């Protein structure tokens, strides 16, 4: 018995597939799937033999194995495809964490001719296969294989193969790729949809090459897709994004003090329940200092607000508007107006209480628990109790004058001079030679009072 992605319970390994006349299971390729939707358009033409993994040379344009998930396409050159440790395995119903292990396989796509006649190479697309399946079913986890990126859940044992059934395209469609909350997609890549864009593109291009009459007939006999994806759609998307931004995306937008002030004021002008804290308007400027009634947020999250990299995983726990109103206890309370200029203004509070329940089966459970522990009642572990936004140090009133007065007193003491040269030696013990010398200097020949030798006292 093997697990089947997308099903709640484990199922047996699929073995239906496409069978040849001798009853042998024939491996089906992406090329076969692509040709199915266009065979009904080959009117008056001799059917071409289908190319499979056994009949077509390995030219890099055919994926020889079916992945359970849609691919991840590169749209920026020079970007490395990798995931953080413990991330990168697509999630699907029915697959336990112990079986979430495998690898991403790089599929080098074919080139195409642009409208101006130039030959362009499509950037590669990556497909996920569980460990022990796919083109490198015999490889061990972590082997150095070109075009392979190994990923695994932290709870998975990578020493054994995953007990996952092979995907039969006639029975199971590709599952849209999605990851556990907190997963960071490699920069320069985007997740494909259901995997049906290639046949739509091929059938659309064929109908355009037949002329207006045949194209009209084809459109009447076949339902047109909602949107036709061209081979160079990734490049066009990138160009449109850059044009929308009006500058190179590689140059970060500079935030000046004036722009940050405008953003902060714009946020603070909104009602309290509509504010979204960020770097320009931190949490405590939006909602006040931390304390028993507002007890969430560590130093880093208070500083960054929703811009904190850990915040998206917390947003998975946030209730929807429907859950807020219909799943909470609500109470309408009238409050006294605090406005002096508007004493008759009616102020109400919609007080609410509720709970968000989750268990260890929630994707990203360990990360969520870690973030919650770091931020719940974090103000109690900080110096001075509740963490407040540290204002610029203010000089106490009169502090400058007091300091200046002390400096003046020190200066006065340092520059004060004795009234006479004799007084400088008052505290010095006089020797007989000193007394004799002083007697000669003075007119009367008598040593003044106060200059007597301390030894005679």
Curated annotation (Swiss-Prot):
Domain CoV N CTD, chain residue ranges per copy: 260-383
A Pfam family assignment: CoV_nucleocap
Biased composition (Polar residues): 49-61, 215-225
Subcellular location: Virion; Host endoplasmic reticulum-Golgi intermediate compartment; Host Golgi apparatus
Biased composition regions of type Low complexity, renumbered to the chain: 9-23, 193-212
Keyword vocabulary terms for this entry: ADP-ribosylation, Host Golgi apparatus, Phosphoprotein, Ribonucleoprotein, RNA-binding, Transcription, Transcription regulation, Viral nucleoprotein, Virion
Annotated SUPFAM superfamilies: Coronavirus RNA-binding domain (SSF110304), Nucleocapsid protein dimerization domain (SSF103068)
Binding site for RNA: 109, 125, 167
Extent of Basic residues compositional bias: 267-277
Region entry Disordered, spans: 1-62, 158-178, 190-228, 249-290, 382-429
Region annotation (Dimerization) ranges: 267-384
Region RNA-binding: start-end pairs: 56-197
Reported modifications of this chain: ADP-ribosylated. The ADP-ribosylation is retained in the virion during infection.
MF annotations from Gene Ontology: RNA binding
Subunit structure: Homooligomer. Both monomeric and oligomeric forms interact with RNA. Interacts with protein M. Interacts with NSP3; this interaction serves to tether the genome to the newly translated replicase-transcriptase complex at a very early stage of infection.
Family membership: Belongs to the betacoronavirus nucleocapsid protein family.
Function: Packages the positive strand viral genome RNA into a helical ribonucleocapsid (RNP) and plays a fundamental role during virion assembly through its interactions with the viral genome and membrane protein M. Plays an important role in enhancing the efficiency of subgenomic viral RNA transcription as well as viral replication.
Listed HAMAP family: BETA_CORONA_NCAP
Protein name: Nucleoprotein
Organism the protein comes from: Puffinosis coronavirus
Lineage, opening ranks: Viruses, Riboviria, Orthornavirae, Pisuviricota, Pisoniviricetes
Gene name of this polypeptide: N
